[in-house]
């Protein structure tokens, strides 16, 4: 029970495909680090981004999201405009065990540059790529490096099984691939 170690993360990734692809060790020379760490896993950001723009002149509405609010970008380095926002996805695909919740926190390398990463919890039973929210809080353009680390995931095992997993309730982001924009079930 509690926070899970590198040995547990490695075992679950090999035996249950919890993280695919899985980086066995922390990779950190010349890149923003990624891979397994002592009590977590540093995820990588893919090379596709949706960057928020004011071209459409619309209001951001989570209940009725207008795709004109974002522009698509693919490349090794994404420039997030000053005081702006981008969406991306992990390279890794997650298969969360039914008794484990994961919490994701931004990496200090980016945080020290004014780049804040937000990811909501990975619920028990969730499967899919993770959509990553990236905020540039600075008055300057900011670089995000594709295929490198972006955030750290901590795995917490529950002391008893939950009654309903994300898979059981057919969560609206279950099995998401690519970058998923906001959804409201109707």
Curated annotation (Swiss-Prot):
Keywords assigned: Hydrolase, Nucleotide metabolism, Nucleotide-binding
A molecular function (GO) term: nucleotide binding
Protein family per UniProt: Belongs to the dCTP deaminase family.
GO biological process: dUMP biosynthetic process; dUTP biosynthetic process; nucleobase-containing small molecule interconversion
Enzyme Commission number(s) from the entry: 3.5.4.13
Gene: dcd
Protein name, UniProt field: dCTP deaminase
Entries under PANTHER family matching the protein: DCTP DEAMINASE
Known catalytic reactions: dCTP + H2O + H(+) = dUTP + NH4(+)
Pathway noted in the entry: Pyrimidine metabolism; dUMP biosynthesis; dUMP from dCTP (dUTP route): step 1/2
Subunit: Homotrimer.
Protein's organism: Campylobacter curvus (strain 525.92)
Source organism phylogeny: Bacteria, Pseudomonadati, Campylobacterota, Epsilonproteobacteria, Campylobacterales
Described function: Catalyzes the deamination of dCTP to dUTP.
Enzyme class: hydrolase
Active site annotation, chain numbering: 133 (proton donor/acceptor)
A Pfam family matched in the record: DCD
């Amino acid at each position: 029970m509690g926070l899970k170690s590198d040995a547990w993360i490695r075992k679950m990734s090999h035996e249950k495909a919890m993280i695919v692809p899985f980086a066995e060790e922390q990779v950190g020379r010349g890149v923003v680090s990624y891979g397994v760490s002592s009590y977590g896993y540093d995820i990588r950001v893919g090379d596709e981004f949706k960057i928020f723009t004011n071209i459409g002149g619309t209001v951001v509405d989570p209940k009725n999201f207008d795709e004109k609010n974002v522009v698509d970008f693919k490349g090794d380095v994404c420039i997030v405009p000053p005081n702006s926002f981008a969406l991306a996805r992990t390279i890794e695909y997650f298969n969360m065990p039914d008794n484990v919740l994961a919490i994701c926190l931004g990496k200090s390398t980016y945080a020290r540059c004014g780049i804040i990463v937000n990811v909501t919890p990975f619920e028990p039973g969730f499967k899919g790529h993770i959509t990553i929210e990236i905020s540039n809080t600075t008055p300057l353009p900011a670089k995000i490096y594709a295929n490198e680390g972006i955030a750290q995931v901590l795995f917490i095992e529950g002391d008893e099984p939950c009654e309903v997993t994300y898979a059981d309730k057919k969560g609206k982001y279950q099995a998401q691939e690519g970058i998923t924009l906001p959804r409201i079930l109707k």
